[in-house]
Amino acid sequence: MARLAVFLLAVFLGGFAMSDEAQAADPENTLLLNLKDGQVVIEMRPDLAPKHVARIKELVRQGFYDGLTFHRVIGGFMAQGGDPKGNGTGGSGVNIPAEFSDQPHVRGTLSMARSSDPDSADSQFFIVFSRSRFLDGKYTVWGQVTKGMKHVGKIKRGDESRNGTVDDPDKIIRMRVAVDVK
């Protein structure tokens, strides 16, 4: 009986160790997004969108996203941020060619916002709250929330009659590439 208890304890603790390793498996392609309610861990997908992931990391390392707002948030759909103007019209000034894939937009997917021009993505991104099939193959998927989606779900919602525009919007407190965090 004692051996069984020791074995079960080892399996239990081993499961925790493996999950920690899985979260930190690729710190160069993991983002840590700090929101008012807590930290969100994002697995970036350079296998799906190498140019977008490279540009996001470049902007993150410049501190570009720190303090920017989630200017457009539609309940049951998504939260959009990454615009230095805070109104959906701004960016970093560098457009990225589309890298569409067959990766579905499921809860926690990060994808690039853009205009009607498929190659107009810049710095703005959105996180979907629920399965959004109508986006599949039309927007560049570059990441997935792996931890902290409950914090994303608490981002202040916008006025649906104004296409989700948020008065006094929540901000990105800080965004970092995990490998850069000491």
Name each region found by the language model.
Residues 8, 12-182:
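Cyclophilin-like peptidyl-prolyl cis-trans isomerases
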Residues 1-8:
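Bacterial N-terminal signal peptides that target proteins for export
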